[in-house]
Amino acid sequence: MATIKKSININAPVEKVFEYGTPEILPEIWPSLIEVKNIKELPNGGYSWDWVYKMAGMRFNGSSEHTEVVPNERTVSLSTGGIESTITWEYQPVDDGTKFTITTEYKVPIPLLGKLAESFIVKMNENEQEVVLANMKAMMET
């Protein structure tokens, strides 16, 4: 399993950032997430959805579900299918707005390519997570 944890400060209130973080907006902020569909609300206040993701030139289909939702604090989603992962979005109030943190734990879905390819994919995904954070910041501050 690979783990990536990155944060950014956003000049917007926690409530606004949390409310925006729904599956519908994911393709707007996540460049490799090609499609999100079949979004359904869950009794825990979260969602389930299907997705299409492109990594290292390969296309993956899967499903995600919020397994934990603490309003204005955190969401945890579990993804199955093409890429198995757990993604936690944390929202922490800070003086100038919100500290937004994404922690992604995932299984690199290309075992046959070995450690070199895995290192490349992990680095690529670290860069992608920085882009997601920057895009969320841009959407919230405009």
Regions found by a protein language model. Name each.
Residues V14, G46, E73-R74, T88, ...:
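Structural motif
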Residues I4-K6, Y47-W51, G62-S64, I87, ...:
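Hydrophobic residues positioned within well-ordered beta-strands of beta-sheet architectures
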Residues M1-N44:
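Hydrophobic ligand-binding cavity/cleft-lining segments
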Residues E28, N38-I83, V131-T142:
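Glycine-rich portal/gate segments that line the openings of hydrophobic small-molecule binding cavities
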Residues I10, Y53, T104-Y106:
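Hydrophobic beta-strand positions in extracellular immunoglobulin-like domains
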Residues L78-V131:
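Beta-strand/loop substructures that line and gate deep hydrophobic ligand-binding cavities in soluble
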Residues S7-N11, E65, E90-Q92:
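Generic structural detector for well-ordered beta-strands
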